[in-house]
Amino acid sequence: MKTFVRRYYVFAAIALWAIACWAFFQFWYPYHFFFQEQNQLFLWSSDYISSYLHPFRFAALIGDFLTQFYYYLYVGAIIQTACITIAGLLVYQAFRNFHVARPFALAISLALMTFVAVCHFSTSYRLSSTISIMSWTLTLWLVSLVYSRNKRLTIAACNLLVPTYLLFGLPEIKTIQKPDFILEKDFAVDCEYYFGNHDKVISIVESSEEHSSQMLFFYNLVQAQRGQLPENLLKFTPTDLGTFYKIGPETPMLTIRNMNELYWALGDMTFTERAAMMTNVFSHNNRNVRMMKRLAECNYVSGDTLAAEKYLRILDKTFVYHRWADNVRAHGKDIYRSKMEMVNQRDTITIGDNAHFLMMQLLDRNPDNTIALDYILCSTLLLKDIVNFKRDYDRYCTDKNKPRLKTLYQEALCIWLAGTNAPKEEWMKYIQRQDVLQRFQQYNSQRGNPAFKDTYWYYFDKIKAPDV
């Protein structure tokens, strides 16, 4: 029994480490894999693959090839753990060939594996760096193998370092850091929204104790598409609608990615295409398969079938998304019929990122675009801009005889009516919810009372408006 333990405890320790590593990344850090898969593009074409045939690029070729399979559940953690474990086993065998004692060789192996795993806590750390480390550990193992059999040839075997360097280059090394579980939550809501799991987005946000702007952006985006943005706008403060975003040199990558989702939901294909292009620019190697899909979609919806086909042909050369491209060609009109009805067909020139003007254009084209309506009204309310809220409410609700009797809007109208000393007829015209009117009277007798934290009146009096 002791002989058995001495013989196999090393591999048992490495196997247990590998299981723990896989479990951690699969169950506590899975969305990092989806994020990396979506932020690259790998094509099965000779022209594309030939772009990797340069010094130091072979690790990138293998890494990007394997990363595309992160699309599939469980596969990302399996690939990453397998690569790290192989590197660890090679290091262990190499040091054993150099006659290092088993416990020390095992300690070195586990230390390397742990360090590489920690590097993967960073989203910017690519699988190609781990592939590069594997190549160097393989070279070390080959040199050690020669050393164990013929020490005189060891120096000659060291010549393997040159081709290894030319093929794989040097790996990127990250500083020691903790897992970023806040960023993982950001990726979670982003990916679940992308996958169409809107209920899960709401569940993640509402069950979290802390909320980032990314989480609240997608929470509001889901609620808007369900027609429930006014009911949930003030559930978490400060909140984030995305309508005040500006693209510039200091704009975070996640913010740039979010903008195309906002414009797509609103129905503006020109701004969707622009935002998708910007995301491509700031992605890994300026390639982003998720944005390729979005560019195909927005051009298809806007009627530019030639441009859409250009992106669909690119996706035809991917392993994962070629079926998606075929489905768009076959059923695109049915899939995007409702989106086509929202599109602004007028020729307009828009300068800058003025989301308010953009939403006005969309509503002038289609007054039934409730997503744009709620976003334009809620945006002005977040800024406490009651005058412009009233103007937009009249233009798109009152004047069209389609009052949107949401509690939030009724509460905001109470503020405008009270502030302008409106006559009774105006109150009767705008305030059609008697429960809101009664509560407004109660609030006026105890302004700022936390018992009214769920009202717009409390927000208007007590909460700081976002800086624009």
Where are the regions that the model predicts?
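Membrane-interface coil-to-helix junctions
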Residues: W22, Q26-L66, Y70-V75
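Transmembrane-helix motifs of polytopic, lipid-linked glycan transferases
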Residues: T81-H99, M113-V116, T137-S144
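Internal/C-terminal transmembrane anchor helices
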Residues: T154-Q177
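Soluble catalytic regions of membrane-associated enzymes that act on cell-envelope
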Residues: K178-N344, T348, R365, N369-L383
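Terminal, low-structured helical/coil segments at or just beyond the last alpha-helical repeat
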Residues: L362, N421-V468
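Membrane-helix interface and helix-disruption motif detector
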Residues: F65-I78, F98, H120-S132, K151, ...
